[in-house]
Amino acid sequence: MAVVTPDDEMTARVGSNRHSTFEIGSISKGLTGMLYRNAVERGLVSSTTILGELLPLEGYGEVGSVTLESLATHRSGLPGLPPGMHPLRRTLGFWIRGENPYGDSLAGLLDQTHAVRVGAPRPRYSNLGFQLLGHAVAEAAGSSYAQLLHDVLGPEFSTPARVADLGPADLTGFDRFGRPMQPWVGEAIAPAGGIRSTIDTMRSLLRSLLDGTSPGMSALDPTAKFTPRVGIGAAWITLEHNGRSITWHNGSTGGFSSWIGLDRAAGTGVVVLTAVHRSVDRQGFRILEEFATRAR
């Protein structure tokens, strides 16, 4: 866990060290949102750029006509997962044997979009959408997603594509019953849920978000409604919690859970990472409220 306030930075660890990396799950979407907004600011893409301008989607139906902005705000009409991924079969492998359901290459992901239908442009959380967004932005930058992440947000974030890419510092995650789970590695999933980080790297990110120096900061600013009382920027969620405006995202993989939240008015933020598949949302909100109250 890490806490950043206007006056201090704190880190607490149990069962890990400063070099240990965690799967941050869907917090990866928050980083991808920042890469997207940074690319807009640099003139590489615009909010109206469509996928078909950046990825080889000719003959793939409606997918190529989806805009990057609609992907960033989960309003693209894309499903959560592509039907060509055979999600039921993969889900069974995950639940029964703890397998990684997301080991695809980018080429494999694009192949799976052939049968995708684009629905109404209403809020719908989509892993597929953020996978495509991240790789499209990387293509606009003339880079891979992994390289773009390193170039813009720092080389401390890793995106292992294979189990062989993992090292001793990369923790093994466990389900809530203590069963070790296969790591969620894969080229395709990186922008939506495949990033690894240490707690110190996440603390540094938190500081840069609070002081406004991080590239792609505008990703945190809500530009649309996700639900009637919840705003969304480029992945980042903003809501009222006990009278305070909180900007946050969480993450969950087969063996890890994560949470990052900021009370921007109080200049305070919290990150929680754990190598167990058990939600830490409640703890994250509670700790943030406690430290933000002290900071005010």
PLM regions with names:
Residues 10, 58-66, 77-83, 155-165, ...:
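Secretory-pathway/luminal and periplasmic proteins that interact with or process carbohydrate-rich
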Residues 5, 16-127, 143, 175-180:
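Active-site-proximal loop and beta-strand segments within enzyme catalytic domains
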Residues 32-33, 129-134, 200-204:
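Well-ordered alpha-helical segments within folded domains of soluble proteins
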Residues 38-56, 65, 140-167, 214-222:
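Short, well-structured active-site flanking segments
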Residues 1-13, 19-23, 28, 83, ...:
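Catalytic loop of the DD-peptidase/beta-lactamase superfamily, centered on the K-T-G motif
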Residues 67, 126-129, 160-173, 177, ...:
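Mid-domain, small-residue-enriched loop/turn segments at the edges of structured enzyme/sensor domains
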Residues 41, 73, 111, 154, ...:
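Residues at helix-coil transition
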